């Protein structure tokens, strides 16, 4: 997996103070997407064990309380990203108790395959659906267009 940007302290992409990771790779290529640079799987930089360790350390840093992590992109549920996203989410569950996990994807919940559902079964919130320019609404919270759904899973 590759990623474009990591924010160790973020107050924009989800509730509270959190970490945010923007991964590479998106098959949806939504017109009007604000993050087109993340579409190509080979763009950005490699997601390494060192980066994963940094995320875990940041989530556990007691100097800045973080509510959790937001995973966006690109698309964290792109089939080629799922193995690394699953490993990261499993590690967060094991090593960062009480942290919530939000995932943004262009897939709808009812379109997800078994591998993608392994990730979804471990997260707190899934924001699903492609961004649709004609349905864009800046007043929406945590989503860009009105067709997207915020699923509070646990």
Curated annotation (Swiss-Prot):
Keyword ATP-binding recorded: no
InterPro entries reported for this sequence: Aldolase_TIM, NrdG, Organic_radical-activating, Radical_activat_CS
Co-factor: note: Binds 1 [4Fe-4S] cluster. The cluster is coordinated with 3 cysteines and an exchangeable S-adenosyl-L-methionine.
PROSITE patterns hit by this protein: RADICAL_ACTIVATING
Pfam families: Fer4_12
CDD domains noted in UniProt: Radical_SAM (cd01335)
UniProt-listed Enzyme Commission number(s): 1.97.1.-
Alphabetical UniProt keywords: 4Fe-4S, Cytoplasm, Iron, Iron-sulfur, Metal-binding, Oxidoreductase, S-adenosyl-L-methionine
Binding sites annotated in the UniProt record for [4Fe-4S] cluster: 26, 30, 33
Annotated residues for binding of S-adenosyl-L-methionine: 32-34, 74
Gene3D superfamilies, per database record: Aldolase class I
Cofactors named for this entry: [4Fe-4S] cluster
Superkingdom of the organism of origin: Bacteria
One GO CC annotation: cytoplasm
Secreted as UniProt keyword: no
Chief location bin: cytoplasm
Compartments where found: Cytoplasm
Catalytic activity: glycyl-[protein] + reduced [flavodoxin] + S-adenosyl-L-methionine = glycin-2-yl radical-[protein] + semiquinone [flavodoxin] + 5'-deoxyadenosine + L-methionine + H(+)
Protein family (similarity comment): Belongs to the organic radical-activating enzymes family.
UniProt subunit comment: Forms a tetramer composed of two NrdD and two NrdG subunits.
Role this protein plays: Activation of anaerobic ribonucleoside-triphosphate reductase under anaerobic conditions by generation of an organic free radical, using S-adenosylmethionine and reduced flavodoxin as cosubstrates to produce 5'-deoxy-adenosine.
Annotated protein name in UniProt: Anaerobic ribonucleoside-triphosphate reductase-activating protein
